[in-house]
Amino acid sequence: MTIKLHDLRPAPGSKTPRTRVGRGEGSKGKTAGRGTKGTKARKQVPTTFEGGQMPIHMRLPKLKGFRNRFRTEYEIVNVGDIARLFPEGGTVGVDELVAKGAVRKNSLVKVLGDGKLTVKVDVTAHKFSGSAREQITAAGGSVTEL
C-alpha cells in the first residue's frame, strides 16, 4: 500500500491541546500550577530580579568618557603593504588599493610608515603619517593628499 498525502496524520500525543489553568477545580484550577502563597503565586517577578542580591547592572562599572560622533575613521595601509602589493612601483591610488583588496571601496585611506619601501612609488591617499611621507620621498616617490 502506498502512503498518500491525505492519509498522513500526526503521531499520537504530539498535538495536545493547550492547558487552560485556573478554570475550576477539575484540572489545574485554584492555584493554577503556581504552588501556594508567596510573591510568585501572587504576581509576576521581573526577569531581572536576582532575589535580593546586587543586580548585575549595578555590579558592573559605569562606562567612562564618550564616543565622538564626528570622528573620521581611516582604512590603514602601511608602506610595507604598498611595497609588497606593488613591487614594480608606479602610481598607487585608492582605486588601485581597492583593486588589490588592501582597502574597502568608498573608504578613507591613511598611509602609515610600518615596513620598508625601496621602489619609487607615487602615492595618492587621504592622509599620511610623517614617517610614511619620509619613506616615500626618500625612495624617490611623491605624496599627494586628497
Swiss-Prot record:
It comes from the Bacteria. The keyword Acyltransferase does not apply. GO terms for cellular component: cytosolic large ribosomal subunit. Pfam families: Ribosomal_L27A. PROSITE patterns: RIBOSOMAL_L15 (PS00475). Keywords: Ribonucleoprotein, Ribosomal protein, RNA-binding, rRNA-binding. GO terms for biological process: translation. Residues 1-54 are annotated as: Disordered. One of its GO terms (molecular function) is structural constituent of ribosome. The keyword Transport does not apply. Binds to the 23S rRNA. Part of the 50S ribosomal subunit. HAMAP family: Ribosomal_uL15. Belongs to the universal ribosomal protein uL15 family. This is Large ribosomal subunit protein uL15. It comes from Mycobacterium marinum (strain ATCC BAA-535 / M).
